[in-house]
Amino acid sequence: VNAGDMLHLVGKTGDWYETRYRGTAAYVSAKEAYTAVAYLDKASDEVERVIAEGLELLGVPYVYGAVRLHDGTGNFLKNFTTSAFDCSSLMQYIFYQGAGILLDVTTRTQVRQGVPVTWENIARGDLLFYTNAQRYDKTGVERIGHVALYLGVNYILHTASDYAVIEQMSATRKAYFVTARKFF
């Protein structure tokens, strides 16, 4: 765990918060000098189950093109593993495990699912789709290059470049926002 990492707290004992990191119990200091706590409003049971699945995977490595849970038509892949994800495979896995929703395979196909929602109306559990520097000048779905799960209060759960994390959206991330989709 690095300074500035966002973690989901599951309990507190004395001066220590309990969290889950890479599927294992971990502890961080509860002293104010070391820890800032943000409280996020709860959503529907389905949304909370999807988020809980994502929280269990914090710290799992990012691998571009990681094996998907299924092929997009519901055929589950025998070589799937939870040892690595890219952004779209992470969303595909947590939406299926948490709510039984079969998301498609890539960000550019997932963005066609769900109900469009504007930035002003995004809510906990919505998928946020972004462009990136390489795709910024493209149009339509070809502009999409990243997906994240919105947690509320400007926080997202996603995986990009290193491992699955919770992070506060930066100005750059907001500038690359293209659209959002609601599933609940």
Describe the residue ranges of each PLM region:
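Boundary regions of SH3-family modules and the immediately adjacent low-complexity/disordered segments
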Residues: M6, R20-E48
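Conserved beta-strand/loop element in small beta-rich adapter and peptidoglycan-binding domains
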Residues: V1-T13
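Low-complexity, Gly/Ser/Thr/Pro-rich intrinsically disordered linker/tail segments
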Residues: Y176-F184
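Catalytic cysteine-centered active-site loop
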Residues: Y62-R124, F129-Y130, R135, Y176-F177
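Extracytoplasmic/periplasm-facing segments of secreted or lipoprotein envelope proteins
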Residues: I51-G65
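Short, Lys/Arg- and Gly-enriched loop/turn segments at beta-strand edges
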Residues: G14-R20, R135-V147
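Catalytic Cys-His active-site segments of thiol-dependent hydrolases/isopeptidases
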Residues: L102-T107, R143-S170
